[in-house]
């Protein structure tokens, strides 16, 4: 690649994947498989979209020398985001929720082991994400702010609230405003948090950029949710890597709008996201470049 800035970002994404794959938590226990099961779903792959958003901000805002000095600490935070996201997927796949048998081209944990193990591993990954942040060697004020952002957006005011609404209203059609609220919380808030955490971890205090990243992340997250709803009805398990056609009685954008209108809505959101990103370029060209490259790669996989 001829672009040195993008090369730096892409290389860090690859190094993070290596960091993740070599990360191992040893449990002092005589449980026959809990240690293996703990990190299994994390290691089973995935796009690493949320950690890559976090790294996109850091690689753009922190000088390479300063970044290199803190690389391991940044990777701990990126891993914390991935752990919290993975816990949410494990619980979302449970029989009491989506009852999915496949995730990331592998059997879900409750399908491979049992429901109890899946619940406990989800609980463990949730709490481990905050252990990773608290054990970081970043400044104390940064650690506190990172914990605040992740807990607020991944907890009862964010992802958990969205999941609760999704489950409770499974057989009750919602209107567009309600559906948007649901998915802003269930999906978009953690995406938004990943961007905000990147800014906070950089040590740069920029309230205007913080608010922009928050709003941009919410819109981007909504766009990806609409695209995901479309995938559920248009792709099979082999194409998507997860159990599909589960949204028959759920509140999805396809069920509310129909496939054609949902596809148009996704295209509108995608255009708005890319246009918003272009407006960022004059003030933060490296950040715009990193995010644009990541989004274009991911959009290709969803459209």
Name these PLM-found stretches.
Residues 1-303:
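All-alpha prenyltransferase/terpene-synthase fold signal
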